[in-house]
Amino acid sequence: MIGRIAGTLLEKNPPHILVDCNGVGYEVDVPMSTFYNLPHTGEKVVLLTQLIVREDAHLLYGFLTPPERSTFRELLKITGVGARMALAVLSGMSVAELSQAVTLQDAARLTRVPGIGKKTAERLLLELKGKLGADLGPLAGAASPSDHATDILNALVALGYSEKEALAAIKNVPAGTGVSEGIKLSLKALSKA
């Protein structure tokens, strides 16, 4: 298995890149989130990789961060999700956005990714629940994102709201919001419903 590649970036043709490692050029497919953060051609690049061996090809997928690669691997475990769809998901949203969509069970957010319909989105939400890691929680950018969402959710449930109502209200909480402010915003959203 090829787990990491370090070399000179020779070509960039979305979503493919070519990396020269000691005279050998590796074609690597990358999600757009990685592609946009690559250095200029001719510069050094280091990618974490996932090698997929098929009957007719050996395909190499590259990522700049460990969470991107681990999320890609989790997506591949889902029935009906291949490497292309997993790459499309990571190209259409960040790992933090995907984690937030899973935590909030936001199928509408996933259906905005090209190639993901309602049924596929629901299957992704169901099978990814609890698998993306605590460090990739729902409120992207917050100091401890998963703790904030969990605390807000628990507070709303303790106040008598159903988990479904609480999850719908948490969707209105912007990234980086603290627990007390998140509870206030969620309660405002619930009072309007």
Swiss-Prot record:
It is found in: Cytoplasm. Residues 65-139 are annotated as: Domain II. Residues 139-143 are annotated as: Flexible linker. One of its GO terms (biological process) is DNA repair. Keywords: Cytoplasm, DNA damage, DNA recombination, DNA repair, DNA-binding. Residues 1-64 are annotated as: Domain I. GO terms for molecular function: ATP binding; four-way junction DNA binding; four-way junction helicase activity. InterPro entries: DNA_helicase_Holl-junc_RuvA_I, Hlx-hairpin-Hlx_DNA-bd_motif, NA-bd_OB-fold, RuvA, RuvA_2-like, RuvA_C, RuvA_C_sf. GO terms for cellular component: cytoplasm; Holliday junction helicase complex; Holliday junction resolvase complex. It comes from the Bacteria. Residues 144-193 are annotated as: Domain III. Belongs to the RuvA family. The RuvA-RuvB-RuvC complex processes Holliday junction (HJ) DNA during genetic recombination and DNA repair, while the RuvA-RuvB complex plays an important role in the rescue of blocked DNA replication forks via replication fork reversal (RFR). RuvA specifically binds to HJ cruciform DNA, conferring on it an open structure. The RuvB hexamer acts as an ATP-dependent pump, pulling dsDNA into and through the RuvAB complex. HJ branch migration allows RuvC to scan DNA until it finds its consensus sequence, where it cleaves and resolves the cruciform DNA. Has three domains with a flexible linker between the domains II and III and assumes an 'L' shape. Domain III is highly mobile and contacts RuvB. Homotetramer. Forms an RuvA(8)-RuvB(12)-Holliday junction (HJ) complex. HJ DNA is sandwiched between 2 RuvA tetramers; dsDNA enters through RuvA and exits via RuvB. An RuvB hexamer assembles on each DNA strand where it exits the tetramer. Each RuvB hexamer is contacted by two RuvA subunits (via domain III) on 2 adjacent RuvB subunits; this complex drives branch migration. In the full resolvosome a probable DNA-RuvA(4)-RuvB(12)-RuvC(2) complex forms which resolves the HJ. This is Holliday junction branch migration complex subunit RuvA. It comes from Burkholderia mallei (strain ATCC 23344).
